[in-house]
Amino acid sequence: MILLAVLFLCFFSSYSASVKGHTTGLSLNNERLYKLTYSTEVFLDGGKGKLKDSVGYRISSDVDVVLLWRNPDGDDDQLIQVTITAVNVENVNQQRGEKSIFKGKTTPKIIGKDNLEALQRPVLLHLVRGKVKEFYSYENEPVGIENLKRGLASLFQMQLSSGTTNEVDISGDCKVTYQAQQDKVVKTKALDTCKIERSGFTTVNQVLGVSSKATSVTTYKIEDSFVTAVHAEETRDFSLNFLQAIAGKIVSKQKLELKTTEAGPRMVPGKQVAGVIKALDSKYTAIPIVGQVLQSACQGCPSLAEHWQSIRKHLEPENLSNAKAVSSFLAFIQHLRTARREEILQILKAEKKEVLPQLVDAVTSAQTPDSLEAILDFLDFKSDSSIVLQERFLYACGFASHPDEELLRALLSKFKGSFASNDIRETVMIIIGALVRKLCQNEGCKLKAVVEAKKLILGGLEKPEKKEDTTMYLLALKNALLPEGIPLLLKYAEAGEGPVSHLATTVLQRYDVSFITDEVKKTLNRIYHQNRKIHEKTVRTTAAAVILKSNPSYMDVKNILLSIGELPKEMNKYMLTFVRDILNFEMPSSKMIRRVLKEMVAHNYDRFSKSGSSSAYTGYIERSPHAASTYSLDMLYSGSGILRRSNLNVFQYLGKAGLHGSQVVIEAQGLESLIAATPDEGEENLDSYAGMSAILFDVQLRPVTFFNGYSDLMSKMLSASGDPVSVVKGLILLIDHSQDIQLQSGLKANMEIQGGLAIDISGSMEFSLWYRESKTRVKNRVAVVIDSAVTVDSSFVKAGLESRAETEAGLEFISTVQFSQYPFLVCMQMDRAEAPFRQFETKYERLSTGRGYVSRRRKESLVSGYELPLHQENSEMCNMVFPPQPESDNSGGWF
């Protein structure tokens, strides 16, 4: 009895998990003609758009299906013929009316006579247990037409029982899940698992990346082992991570309904399907059911030279602060990606020097084999006449959105050659480090060129050929962030000379917290507490910063807090404000600091009431539920009131992902003799020096020097013009996402998102002995444009959505120090300039014959300028440096 019950349960389970009457796939009746109607339609709109506002089109037809052959040895081995007839193309938006691009057009005019004939030629499907074993069509049919037939054919592939499996259809080799109910089957395709060859790339950094979501659900209604209705819907949503105004949605629907059945032809006799097909028509050939690449030809497009001439004026130096310059830059990159080496080289050789740097930016950013060959042929690294162009090329390589091994190999080859400028040689190595990191982030750490570059960087630090090369290799490691380089960094940080020691600690500062182990913190503690040797305060404060931001232990925090009060005055004040900043901004280590501060020995008035002008402050530029922009400003002075280091950082966060947008560090040393002041401990023998270093979008750039040595300082003070020194200037391709999508309906979708900016970061340091005042300025000016283009193409009609967001913005930091008294007066100001924000949206439908419909929208707003807040002490100091002017008395009179 128990055995019978178990057998019954097993039978009932298998029955309820499959459609009544069959256990595998669809089955056609002998000598019956199934007449169906079929439509595929596509909607395209912004991320939150409504279907009634969409652009798109519908292709509808009748479909005849007939069973041609069934294997005598098994019902689940069938050959069926599918024929499309009565094709029609129309709008999905019925409100288009007189504006419809199809109005007054016949189907042959819309599709093309040859295309229509090909579309209506029948295809054969060899179905085995419900799955397409072979797809037969005629050779040399247009790819777009074949894909439409593949999209229809894929609907006949299904199984009548529940379960998860892998299937090959027009979307590729995909994981699918079936849920079978009474007379109904629901198929869910996991589109993110589909394996299909398609071109595309994206930006590695998640903050600058694109999020997408894809779903596919097909519902079958079954009667007598054949479909009475099929409804399939595929959606593709995307948005730019940090600016969700750049978004879009594609909805693709397919509908197949059985209308009637009638008497059909007799089946073709035969034991093998190959013989049956040959008897039917020897011109039939087996082709993949996986969608093939549809190449979209550009009709009437200008040549590369014509395009360059049309945008050239927008890329002249005086126009680079405008958004139009960036949009022209992005459009030209797209054209360069289809250009040949000879075309590119011809334009480079013909251009004048004023616009050449911008042209070099564009050619390098194109990142194609032809563009790389052209720019390498054009630049001569042995010549000092094109140093600006060489530098622009190298920085564009560093900012490359999707670098490949070939680019790294090219730079390694250049590094082994000779250079007219040592600065360029150093820049090559620094950028090699940036490329190593990007390739490793994209699972390319084991590439031959990457392995070679890593050996070169680490070998240069282990045994540098020249002592001055140490800085170069440290800067390369600051970009590469190789975990195996940490022991070398610790060696240089603890035992190196002042500037080298400081640079090594700043490199450690860029590593992820997970790499700052207890062993690393032991060394950093020795540096901060000067257990083995005296260190400059720039080195000590950086070491403390790394410790306090890397999950410090109770004793790490306690020892640092106990040191406050015993340090040189300005370092004392800096460490005090740094700890307060961690607490105020609720950084991860704030909980541990609060725990230690409960001890009276660590938390007392004498320790935390020291005066000084140095400071550290962090604040928000913008904040939203899913993202945040922060800025931080650190100022460290010598005891005599002269700036030692200013450090301005901007970070962009998206969830747990972060992007180091920019860092501008101005450093000075050895200037005490100018005002007859006493240097701080450990800094008695420093040479006079001032310079600036920058990180831009996670890439460390080569530092620039204002002056080096006392004689250089005096000559520049006497001849100073007050003009700022440029750290980086140029056009950068920041966001770069390209994706070809095979829709299951047979249509081709393409998504392109590019974001670029024109940037100018400059800095200056003014020093007046007469007024006993110094002033430091850092200016950031940017124009930003983000372009998005999404298209759905059938080869004879195309729908598209184009979006653009643009702005021009500026951020200026000014630090004024008056050292005529002690404590000296320091005023820091951070001003964000007024910025316009413009958004554009264009939707269109266009026939291959040229007729089109276009809809445009525009929105513009103005973001007010404001001064970014710093700490209260700074506000009070600024009122003393720049006292409010008394109101003038306009009452008239002689006196």
UniProtKB/Swiss-Prot annotation:
A Gene Ontology biological process in which this protein takes part is: protein secretion
List the PROSITE patterns hit by this protein, alphabetically: VITELLOGENIN
Main location per the UniProt record = endoplasmic reticulum
Q: Pfam families from the entry?
A: MTP_lip_bd, Vitellogenin_N
Keyword terms: Disulfide bond, Endoplasmic reticulum, Golgi apparatus, Lipid transport, Lipid-binding, Signal, Transport
Signal peptide limits: 1-18
The compartments listed are: Endoplasmic reticulum; Golgi apparatus
Quickly give the catalysed reaction: a 1,2-diacyl-sn-glycero-3-phosphocholine(in) = a 1,2-diacyl-sn-glycero-3-phosphocholine(out); a 1,2-diacyl-sn-glycero-3-phosphoethanolamine(in) = a 1,2-diacyl-sn-glycero-3-phosphoethanolamine(out); a cholesterol ester(in) = a cholesterol ester(out); a triacyl-sn-glycerol(in) = a triacyl-sn-glycerol(out)
Q: Name one GO cellular component term.
A: endoplasmic reticulum
Q: Which SUPFAM superfamilies match?
A: Lipovitellin-phosvitin complex, beta-sheet shell regions, Lipovitellin-phosvitin complex, superhelical domain
Q: Which domain of life is it from?
A: Eukaryota
Q: Which cysteines are joined by disulfide bonds?
A: C174-C194
Q: Which InterPro entries is this protein grouped with?
A: Lipid_transp_b-sht_shell, Lipovitellin_superhlx_dom, MTP_lip-bd, MTTP, Vitellinogen_b-sht_N, Vitellogenin_N
Q: Which residues form the Vitellogenin domain?
A: 28-659
Molecular functions (GO terms): ceramide 1-phosphate transfer activity; cholesterol transfer activity; lipid binding; phosphatidylcholine transfer activity; phosphatidylethanolamine transfer activity; phospholipid transfer activity; protein heterodimerization activity; triglyceride transfer activity
Query: What this chain does, per the record?
Result: Catalyzes the transport of triglyceride, cholesteryl ester, and phospholipid between phospholipid surfaces. Required for the assembly and secretion of plasma lipoproteins that contain apolipoprotein B. May be involved in regulating cholesteryl ester biosynthesis in cells that produce lipoproteins.
The UniProt subunit note reads as follows: Heterodimer; heterodimerizes with the protein disulfide isomerase (P4HB/PDI). Interacts with APOB. Interacts with PRAP1.
Q: What is this protein called?
A: Microsomal triglyceride transfer protein large subunit
What species does this protein belong to? Mesocricetus auratus
Higher taxonomy = Eukaryota, Metazoa, Chordata, Craniata, Vertebrata
